[in-house]
């Protein structure tokens, strides 16, 4: 199993050191909530390298008309899982990546302070790949071993009405079924609850 080292970097991940980060508040030095996102750049296109460029601050926003609005945007995520399952890391887990935006969870605002962001290469309109679920499960296991993972939520849970990702094609039931591999955290967000409630209803009818 992969591990996260003392500096907050995942062993074996493709490492890129984004300039888009800052320090976590001292009280949030141990992040225990994971936020799941999806992203493609340009929208709907895979394996372009543009996501890496965005997080590194080197995106050519003139390369495609859909990128123009991203000019000057300074964002990052701790991790990015490509369609192949390859894991890229841009910010140490001990630092504050800029993935959540205006957000609130469990009565707290500014979710970047206390969360780890994981971007999955994908959209709201297509299923994710088997390799991505396998990589995500392994990554969550490493996060749990290092930080005692407490809960896993969607970007849409912490920014309802503003964000929709990782979207309806993300299989929360599948992730929930593998939860013992990463400490059986809570799945209390609305995105997960909708799918899990359907699972419960199927069991009740059986």
Go through the PLM ranges and name each one.
Residues 28, 45, 68, 169-171, ...:
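A generic alpha-helix propensity feature with a strong bias for hydrophobic helices
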Residues 37-39, 155:
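Histidine-centered divalent metal-coordination motifs
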């Amino acid at each position: 199993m992969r591990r996260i080292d003392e500096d907050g970097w995942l062993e074996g991940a493709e490492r890129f050191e984004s300039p888009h980060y800052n320090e976590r508040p001292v009280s949030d030095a141990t992040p225990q909530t994971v936020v799941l996102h999806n992203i493609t750049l340009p929208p709907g296109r895979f394996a372009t390298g543009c996501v890496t460029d965005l997080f590194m601050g080197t995106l050519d926003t003139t390369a495609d008309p859909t990128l123009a609005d991203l000019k000057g945007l300074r964002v990052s995520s701790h991790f990015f899982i490509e369609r192949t399952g390859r894991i890229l890391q841009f910010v140490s887990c001990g630092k504050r990546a800029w993935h959540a935006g205006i957000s609130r969870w469990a009565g707290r605002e500014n979710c970047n302070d206390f969360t780890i962001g994981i971007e999955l290469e994908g959209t709201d309109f297509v299923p994710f790949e088997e390799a991505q679920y396998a990589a995500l499960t392994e990554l969550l296991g490493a996060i749990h071993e290092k930080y005692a993972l407490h809960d896993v939520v969607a970007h849409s849970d912490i920014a309802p009405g503003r964000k929709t990702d990782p979207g309806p094609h993300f299989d929360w039931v599948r992730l929930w079924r593998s939860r013992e591999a990463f400490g059986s955290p809570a799945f209390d967000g609305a995105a997960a609850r909708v799918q899990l409630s359907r699972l419960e209803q199927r069991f009740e009818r059986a």
